């Protein structure tokens, strides 16, 4: 069980004295701390542990057009160099992410989020990009255009 009182007492009260802001393909982030995609779910999993707004951003887990259960277990194996995983892109699908995850995320995370779109055909990528593009708010289209074109 999470000790919310301990967490609340240990949250940073002030912004850092140094300017840690960075530009990621034209998108300004307060700092360069961005958990890797797939390690942070859709953000909700970590919000009881600390104020995730201290992050510069995060990349939500790989999201496909259709919901995917992922690979059968076991999905993780130890090896000499560490571990290997093959989760298999388990996710609720882009429409569920837009309808459920993003509105929930908006209630507690107030910074840019990086979408990780996955697919098995050009048409699936196009569908996901078109759907997620409707959710994006930019002051100019340049960050999206540069990111997609690379």
Could you say what each language-model-derived stretch is?
Residues 2-112, 119-120:
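N-terminal capping/small domains of soluble enzymes
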Residues 40-42, 125, 138:
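Aromatic side chains
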Residues 125-132:
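Distinct, well-ordered alpha-helical segments
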Residues 133-137:
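A short alpha->loop->secondary-structure connector
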Residues 138-145:
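Conserved small/polar residues in nucleotide/adenosyl-binding loops
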């Amino acid at each position: 069980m999470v000790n919310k009182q301990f967490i609340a007492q240990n949250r940073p009260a002030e912004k850092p004295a140094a300017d840690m802001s960075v530009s990621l393909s034209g998108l300004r982030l307060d700092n360069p701390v961005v958990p890797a995609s797939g390690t942070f779910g859709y953000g909700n999993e970590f919000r009881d542990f600390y104020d995730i707004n201290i992050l510069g951003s995060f990349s939500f887990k790989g999201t496909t057009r259709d919901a995917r259960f992922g690979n059968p277990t076991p999905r993780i194996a130890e090896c000499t160099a560490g571990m290997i995983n093959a989760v298999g892109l388990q996710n609720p699908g882009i429409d569920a992410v837009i309808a459920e995850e993003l509105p929930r995320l908006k209630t507690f995370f107030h910074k840019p989020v990086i979408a990780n779109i996955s697919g098995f055909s050009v048409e699936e990528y196009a569908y996901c990009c078109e759907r997620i593009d409707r959710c994006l708010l930019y002051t100019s289209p340049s960050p999206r255009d540069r990111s997609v074109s690379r």
